[in-house]
Amino acid sequence: MKIEPITGSEAEAFHRMGSRAFERYNEFVDLLVGAGIADGQTVVDLCCGSGELEIILTSRFPSLNLVGVDLSEDMVRIARDYAAEQGKELEFRHGDAQSPAGMEDLLGKADLVVSRHAFHRLTRLPAGFDTMLRLVKPGGAILNVSFLHLSDFDEPGFRTWVRFLKERPWDAEMQVAWALAHYYAPRLQDYRDALAQAADETPVSEQRIWVDDQGYGVATVKCFARRAAA
């Protein structure tokens, strides 16, 4: 089954939404700080979308060597244009998170590999985590934050999710897109199994998966692992 990239008007809509809500990235940035992000490191952002995270991170850590990768050529174009508008010289490239093809020069080189709100779209979830672990250097870390399937929400969580969608300043098309994102998202056990499968190929010294709604308003799954030192 082939994953479909976000293109055209949908890509533009995601960029408009992301560029107007930088505060929604605060929790993820805090998680990255906890994972040890620091100036001078190499960081790869898989499924980077239109590059909002890159703008935020390089504003806080100006010496990062940051590479954004996305399957959508439209998203890559938008990200490059957006970075130029913000006066940033950033690298964005076309690539599939489910394969390191096109990222061979980065294999085993990154201090940190991240992805935010994207792995729910993957058709081969273990392959996504495999790519993350292969890109990160021994001793480096990966961090993924993703949507949960609705079946993992308890009743209060589901009510919060419904209220969250209704309160977003989105048009009907975007509300449907986000609702479907959760409906088709993997279950919590799927994330656990996928990370464990990837770790069988590239050993890790630490891994943790947890769920909370901190900083976002709706429960999301956080997946962290540290590649075993050589």
Swiss-Prot record:
**Which segments cross the bilayer?**
none
The top EC class is: transferase
Write out the GO biological process terms.
antibiotic biosynthetic process; methylation
Enzyme Commission no: 2.1.1.-
Q: Which Pfam families would you find in this protein's record?
A: Methyltransf_25
What family is this? Belongs to the methyltransferase superfamily.
Listed name of the protein = C-methyltransferase CouO
The gene for this chain is couO
